[in-house]
């Protein structure tokens, strides 16, 4: 209350009213004071006054509800496009044994290091690589395997079927592979183990217009487990003592490989490709889930490919034309993360005549500005979580 009788007060709803002397109070029947609401002031929690007649109001900022993102993680969706995984997924139940879902029991300390989901996947992986019987050493691989959407590179390993892969995943996950596939490096080699990774010039095998990447000096199953890590951030620990004996026998009989050899080869490959988190997880005899890194790598790749120099390394094949800028992306990631984009890019008739001479498809989204679309694309292409919204209002 001021010296002249003026009063300031706030309501429970956060509005402020000021009681002032009515200049018409001299007229009969007119009240001496009147209340008026202070405009454009909301969410007030307290009001103050001093002996000079000045008033103040303390306003609380609106606490918005936290934004929660639901759905698959980036690593989940990338696992779904793992080139050899469609066939393995079809066999997932076929190769599951009754005891596979309860392997660990009370011995398992951490759920993330459980083999409950891994053993059926290891069975499917062995079924993909190794023939069903010793009398069928040259079993044919289904032609459906070679129709992997978006595959633009093929990995060749001695005595194994060619496996298509996505260049954007390999380049984002390993700077060594990025250097190889962009032509900056011709070959990488580990001299003690004689493991060699190189890009083969020309076309070999049944793939046309697909870049061949050769890996020699290691078993095919080691390369496929490495691919599984690059796509999923997970690891299939075939050397874990908890893996059923029949799987180990299958690898030794048909693949001519001991599970502990695979672990050693993976260490060499991880060091060669500079994957320190994978190297750290391979120090244990039992499964140790690697620290997640897919989001970090894809965030860096998404930012880098927006620069002119990034196009040479990452080779984006989609340009989203927004109202105020153009954004470079990869169709393989967009189709894996969004049914909207999958409906376009999975249709060969839609894409056939839309490729530009630069090898890109331009998608016109001129009705959308970059500011709101930035968060959508950071979620789709980089897998970022709700923390990216912390910058709102800054």
Segments from the language model and where they lie:
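Short coil/turn segments at secondary-structure boundaries
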Residues: 4-5, 12-15, 20-23, 50-52, ...
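Eukaryotic intrinsically disordered and solvent-exposed regulatory patches
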Residues: 2-5, 31-35, 40-45, 52, ...
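Periodic beta-strand elements of RCC1/NHL beta-propellers and select beta-solenoids
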Residues: 1-52, 57-133, 167-168, 235
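Flexible, disordered linker segments and immediate boundary regions flanking tandem C2H2 zinc-finger modules
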Residues: 70-72, 188-193, 288-300, 350-360
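Intrinsically disordered, low-complexity domain-flanking/linker segments in eukaryotic proteins
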Residues: 24-34, 186-206, 237-257, 351-354, ...
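N-terminal BTB/POZ boundary and linker segment
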Residues: 82-167, 228, 232-236, 243-335, ...
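Alpha-helical oligomerization interface recognition
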Residues: 152-208, 220, 225-227, 274, ...
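Eukaryotic tandem repeat interaction scaffolds
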Residues: 1, 360, 365-366, 392
